[in-house]
Amino acid sequence: MTKLIIHLVSDSSVQTAKHAANSALAQFTSIKQKLYHWPMIRNCELLNEVLSKIESKHGIVLYTIADQELRKTLTKFCYELKIPCISVIGKIIKEMSVFSGIEIEKEQNYNYKFDKTYFDTLNAIDYAIRHDDGQMINELSESDIILIGPSRTSKTPTSVFLAYNGLKAANIPYVYNCPFPDFIEKDIDQLVVGLVINPNRLIEIREARLNLLQINENKSYTDFNIVQRECIEVRKICNQRNWPVIDVSTRSIEETAALIMRIYYNRKNKYHK
């Protein structure tokens, strides 16, 4: 199997370069990859340390660096080593500048911008934590999105991912033979999404969870008929109310959240023209 080394160099958290790399790597199933993360590279001394690592471990370099001198040093070094050096957002910034007629700012301000978006994200994260697993149902009216589904269908991580995108998401578990909150009988403005999964896959996940917690008494938790019934009931609840249902059997959390956001914004645009 071909091995590919990728160096992710950033003057910030390296997440932008990491997302770009992972998106590209998803197109290659036969590549074994090794990613080296080099965050907070903001001066020549730190960059030189990274360059020595790149020299010892040749590979593609993906970078997001605002400082012009640091960029020049990095690209020149990679050129001499004859290895690719790619600016993740450089092309985007250039096209924005050309299209808008606004010059690119030469100086980089490393102080994070504490704007409304930042505080909306913090509030959404706090909301997701406080309204996890059916907690504080009386405050559902404050949410943007409500996720329902059987236990271990990725409701919690999906809620957190949505929160990082500024959306307040509550999640409520569906448990076999347990009464579901009466909010489903009311007309609500929030987007409600049901999450289901292949029963066999869900049993595997639940068994792994029980083994991790060293629990071997909860047989109904991994009983196929009960697990299957839980997924069927969630579909039934959603179908009766025209709520969307997402099968997460083969989806990553990011994919599930992205699909939910698409539904949410399509719905928002439809009713708020």
UniProtKB/Swiss-Prot annotation:
Known catalysed reaction(s)?
A: N(tele)-phospho-L-histidyl/L-threonyl-[pyruvate, phosphate dikinase] + ADP = N(tele)-phospho-L-histidyl/O-phospho-L-threonyl-[pyruvate, phosphate dikinase] + AMP + H(+); N(tele)-phospho-L-histidyl/O-phospho-L-threonyl-[pyruvate, phosphate dikinase] + phosphate + H(+) = N(tele)-phospho-L-histidyl/L-threonyl-[pyruvate, phosphate dikinase] + diphosphate
Q: What is its EC class?
A: transferase
Question: Which InterPro entries does the record match to this protein?
Answer: Kinase-pyrophosphorylase (IPR005177), P-loop_NTPase (IPR027417), PPDK_reg (IPR026565)
Detail which positions bind ADP: G149, P150, S151, R152, T153, S154, K155, T156
Q: Which UniProt keywords apply?
A: Kinase, Nucleotide-binding, Serine/threonine-protein kinase, Transferase
**Pfam families attached to this UniProt entry:** Kinase-PPPase (PF03618)
An annotated Gene Ontology molecular function: ATP binding
Keyword Ligase among UniProt keywords: no
Give me the segments passing through the membrane. none
Give yes or no: UniProt keyword Repeat: no
**EC number(s)?**
2.7.11.32, 2.7.4.27
Task: Spell out the NCBIfam families in the cross-references.
Answer: PRK05339.1 (NF003742)
The record's family statement is: Belongs to the pyruvate, phosphate/water dikinase regulatory protein family. PDRP subfamily.
Role of this protein: Bifunctional serine/threonine kinase and phosphorylase involved in the regulation of the pyruvate, phosphate dikinase (PPDK) by catalyzing its phosphorylation/dephosphorylation.
Q: What is the name of this protein?
A: Putative pyruvate, phosphate dikinase regulatory protein
